[in-house]
Structures are given as structure tokens and as C-alpha cells.
Amino acid sequence: MLKKHEKFYYGGDYNPEQWDESVWKEDMRLMKKAGVNYVSINIFSWARLQPDEETYDFSTLDKIMDMLAENGIGADLATATAAPPAWLSRKYPDSLPVDKDGSRFLPGSRQHYCPNSKDYARLAAKLVRKIAERYKSHPALVMWHVNNEYGCHISECYCDNCKKGFQTWLKEKYGTIENLNKSWSTDFWSQRYYEWEEICLPGKTPTFANPMQQLDYKAFMDDSLLALYKMERDILKTYTPDVPVMTNLMGLHKPVDGFHWAKEMDLVTWDAYPDPFEDIPYAQFMAHDLTRSLKKQPFLLMEQAAGAVNWRAQNAVKAPGVMRLWSYEAAAHGADGIMFFQWRASQGGAEKFHSGMVPHSGDEESRNFREVVQLGNELKNLEKVTGSAYASDVAIVFDWKNWWALELDSKPSSLVTYIKQLLPFYRVLHTQNIGVDFIHPDEAMDRYKVVFAPASYRVTKTFADKVKAYVENGGYFATNFFSGIADENERVYLGGYPGAYRDILGIYVEEFAPMKKGAVHQIRTGYGDAAIRVWEEKIHLKGAEALAWFKDGYLAGSPAVTAHHCGKGKAYYIGTQPDEQYLSSLLKEILKEADVRPALDAPRGVEVAVRKNGHEKFLFLLNHTDQVQFVDAGGTYPELIYGRTEAETVRLSPRDVKILQVIEK
């Protein structure tokens, strides 16, 4: 995956330019003590590298790169384009982005550039070329890091450059203005266009903007950011074709289509910042699986906090053992490296209260640094794990374009949001220790025994046909309410809901009945009554059988959850948002029927995850509780972290982790 990738990577963002050179020597000593072998540098250094448009100064970066090489530490060398210098904004004010109200953003923080600014792109390209020329053969160079967290702060711009770019993008997509009018349903509200130049960005309008205009604009902005990444990547590849190139994604980050971007990267990395106030941050765990799934290969955890962050309203610190536990959680789900932001906590600037691997005190005996040292030295034992695959028989469909479409305005209920619909399914599977891949609608489904597609509102005919073939050939498929409703042009499938899925599911939904916020109703199930929220609907059986029934109001007695035998497989439909206890029982039943089982039985709160490398299997056992737990491993196996053979009954201390190495015969 990485250049000379023979070990598990460990380190963090290193910003020595913020410190006097007298501190650097101490940094090298502490890095060696902590087992650091890899650092990200130069991410926010443009202003130092280029004091004006004609002048470049690489003297400090030269020293940093040489120092890393001398100490055997690899460099993830960034292109420094994430924060343009003040002189650029002053000289080229139209490089600054514009918000929906028409106000231009000011410099003074970061990411203050319009994705379609020709001046920004020209100057960024020139800088990247100089960096690539200078360091292409440097012994410290391991990987290129393009920009930083695209779309984190500025994912949309409403300037004239973007307006013209959007018009050009639309011409390329649709070919003719009539094709656009048809796709956008412009005969509604007298929105028909006759010239491309008539089309505006979906900015501030009296009421709801055209839905397809909004969706195309989101895709255009995603493409615009990706074009900047590809520009830098192509320059780097010209000088170093064999050095991996990536940028750090942000997991469940709505503006940037991860599947779209992953095709353009040599490996995928992401920045994870779970909230320590959550006992088990399932959304972050889900993002690990999503990130790995973007290329179906190991990823790097490029940033996490050693303790607290600084940008929430209340910034909890990670309790003793939590940083270590959550780091191994990333490794269990496919990470081949664990990195932090940042190495040394900053003395000044906006993130000075964001924890570092080295705290403000510099105290080697602080809990913060002792945990950093412990983890770094333990990870040296994971070389065998690097490059191994994550084992999963179950997939969840994830589609950014569907996410964008589902959460547009003017839908039946604003309570129906994408991640909130996916997360209960993921959480149930995680607690049952069922490995999960995420798949794009264009990917093959056949290798999975079960495929879940919650909240799949936007469905192409091609995908619906693929699902039907999958089920007919023996697959198990499950979706829920408000799915199969609209096509890729945001046009409703006629003939009755759930549109594209009607035949597969064997049902007809006559009408939606969204629930009031906070309302709780009941359904009758084979496991007893269960609470439901958010949504009800009138379902008619057209070949399916009912598994649960609504109990309240005019829907009382009508089906709420259904199953439909279709060919050799089965398709399930959940017409409401049930409580997690019922969802867990239902999913367990589906998994059992599809012959999907966890690798080991474990007590609640103990996670079992599997990575495989040929006949070698690595069982990660993670205790997410504050109690001692025991797991029957079914045999005695070598344990990688502690370097000893574990008894058949494995003892896990509170928040402890063990990794069993199993050779399959």
C-alpha cells in the first residue's frame, strides 16, 4: 500500500516550524521513545515557503526533511496548499470564496479559496511543482499528502467563477438545454431555460430551489474540489510515479463523495474525532468501515486526538485506556497506521487547546504521553497484520448522491436523514459482531450473503434490476421506508411506492404517514410489542407476508414489516423506524437464515473483529466495558500485543484489547 510498507505506521502531524530549533532535537528523542516512525509535515506551511509571489524559501523544510531522514522517520510530505498566504488573498481577492448570501469570506483562518479560482489553482500548481522537484528523491519521503480535509469548511462557493464553471459543467453533462429542461422538470414553476447563461447557482431564492439544480450543484462542487486534487496529484506523479499520493478524507462527510474520490487516490486515509462523551461512538466506527470500503483495502487513520479536541462546545478528554482502545478499533477494521493531530500541542493559534501526543507540559510521565508511548511500542508487534483484509459477509449500500437527494428540502419529513437511518442498522450489526462492508450501488453484490439498503430514496433502474437478480439468485436484501422512491433525476417512480423496489419487495405502499416529532407508537411483532418513531405508512401485501403490524390509529392492523420470497432469496421491508431491540431481533433472524454468524460468541460490550491474510486470521477482541470480560476462543493461540499464548478462555481487563493469531488449516 505504501512505499516500502513493512511496518505498522505510527505518528502524527509534525509542525516544527512552530517551534524554535532547540526543541527539534528533543522531538526526535521523544519520537524514538514513543515508537514514532512516520509523520505528516508541511500541511500549513505555504506562507513560510513563499513570502511573496516571486520568492520561495525551502531552507526550513530542508532541515526538517534531513532531520527526519537522519532519525529514520518517514515523511508524509504535504503540498501546503490548504491555507493560501495573505499576500495571495490581497493580490487576487477573487480567489476568496463567496457564501450563499453573496458575502466574500476573508483570510485569517484556513481553506479560504474558491475551488474554481484560476489564480489559486495556478499558484498552487507552481508551488507543488517546486516541492516535487526539490524532494522527489529525498530519503525521508514516503508518501505525498495533497492539501488537507477538502470541503471541511468551504464546500460550496457562489462566486461568478463558480457560476460560469457550473454552466460549462451542465453543458458537458446534458449536451443540450432541452435535455437539462427534461431532467430538471423545469415546466414546474415556469423554470424552463433557453440559454445556458440563464442558469444561476442555487443560492438565495424566495422558496425551494429546483431539486435537480441543487443536486447538480453539489456534484459540480464535488467535481471542482476533486479537480484541484487531481491537478496536484498529476504534478506529483510526473516527478515520483511510484510514491503514493492521497488526501485525508473525513469519513461521514456529506460534501465529498468518498467513492468518487477513492478512485483517484493510491490509498484512503481519514481523520477521526469521536466524542469521548459517547461511551461507544458507533458513527466513528461506521466511518472506519466506510473508509476501508472505498477501495476495499487497508486505510490509514491520518488524524485523531490523543486526548481532547478544542472545537466542540464542551471538549471531553479521553478517559484512561480509551485512546488505546479506539486506536485498536481502527486497526481491527482495516487501519494499517495510527496517526494523531498533532505531535506537540501548539502554544498559540486557534487549536492550542487541541491535545497533542506531547502535552503543553512536555512531561514524559504525564498520562497523555505514557499512553502514547505504550501504544506506539505495542503497534510494533502488528507487522503481520499490515496488508491483511477485513472479513465480511454483509454489506450496507452507501451512496453520496442518495444522501444529497434524501436531505433536500420539501420531503414528507425532515426527520428522515441518511446517517440517522443507516446508523441503527450498523450499530445492531456491530453489537452482534457481524463484519460490515459498505458498497456503492455500482459495485457487485454477489459476494455478500446479506445486503442492507436503508434510506435508499434515490434508486436507478439499473440498481433495482441488480437487487432483483441478487435476490433471485439467493441473496438476502433488506430496506426500509421511503426507499425506491425517485430516480437519478429526482423524478418519482409512478405506479405506487416503493417504486423501483415494488416487485422485489412484493408490496404496495398506498400512502405515507409521517409521525410528529417526539411521537411514539407501537407495532405488534413476533417478539412482542415494539416502539416506533418518525414514520408510518399504509402497506398492501402483493406477494409478501407480514412480520409485524401497526397498532395505532387508522393504520392499526395493517402490515408494518414484511418479507418476500423472490426466487432463491428473500427481500425484507421495514415500513417504520422501530426501537433497536426489535431491529436487533429482526436482523438476527435475517442473518441466521442467510447463515451469517459472528467469528466468536462474546459477552455484550466485547467486540470481535477479523482480519485475514490467506490462511492466517487475526481475531481482534476489544472490551468496550469497564468490567473484566471473558471470551471462549475455542483454542489456544499466540497473542500479538502481549507476545504470549492465550488460554482458551481469554481474559480481557476493562477497555483492554487482545489480538489472536489463528492459522487456518
UniProtKB/Swiss-Prot annotation:
Annotated active site: E149 (proton donor), E303 (nucleophile)
Annotated InterPro entries: Beta_galactosidase_C, Beta_galactosidase_Trimer, Class_I_gatase-like, Glyco_hydro_42, Glyco_hydro_42_N, Glyco_hydro_b, Glycoside_hydrolase_SF
Example GO molecular function: beta-galactosidase activity
Signal peptide interval: none
A Pfam family it matches: Glyco_hydro_42M
GO cellular component, one term: beta-galactosidase complex
Reactions listed under catalytic activity: Hydrolysis of terminal non-reducing beta-D-galactose residues in beta-D-galactosides
GO biological process, one term: galactose metabolic process
Top-level taxonomic group: Bacteria
Record: residues binding substrate: R110, N148, W311, E351, K352, F353, H354
Keywords: Glycosidase, Hydrolase, Metal-binding, Zinc
Family of the protein in this entry: Belongs to the glycosyl hydrolase 42 family.
PANTHER family: BETA-GALACTOSIDASE GANA
Protein name: Beta-galactosidase LacZ
Source species of the chain: Heyndrickxia coagulans (Weizmannia coagulans)
